Amino acid sequence: MSGKVIGKTLPLGYRGNVARTPDLIIGAFNNVGSANIPYGAPVIYDATNKGVRAVATTDSTASQLVGIAVRHIGQPKSDSPSGWYYAPGETVDVLLRGTICIETKAQTGIAARGQVYVDATDGEFTSVSTSNMAMPNTIFATGEYDANKISEVTILSRSI
């Protein structure tokens, strides 16, 4: 929910921030993939390696999507100017149910209770259904987004 002060609209939050906290479930999984998982990114459950990984271009099954990587407070990684991610082998906090702030690459068509999609080519969230995977049980909470392309989405029920 965005705040307003003297005609100014405040940001909704930051990528990966949990919002509206009373009803949420967060699970901890190892990053078993070879890629970094940015805060606020969708994650795939890897049953073979018993952990989560970032979305890859070869992914096409939405049922593999289990949640969104939660932002945590700490020092950024020194190898990247935007070093806010979980590296391979680290424990990833994953929102399994609840509301979280995400960055959307396409804001066209965002509507309250509208379906959230994931683009497998870059692992980013979008509101566009064409050639994208529907994130299971996940909707845009308010249909709003701020100047930083941040939207609130709600995962209605856990899938793992």
Question: Where are each of the predicted segments found?
Answer:
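Surface-exposed, low-hydrophobicity beta-strand/loop segments enriched in small/polar/acidic residues
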Residues: 1-160
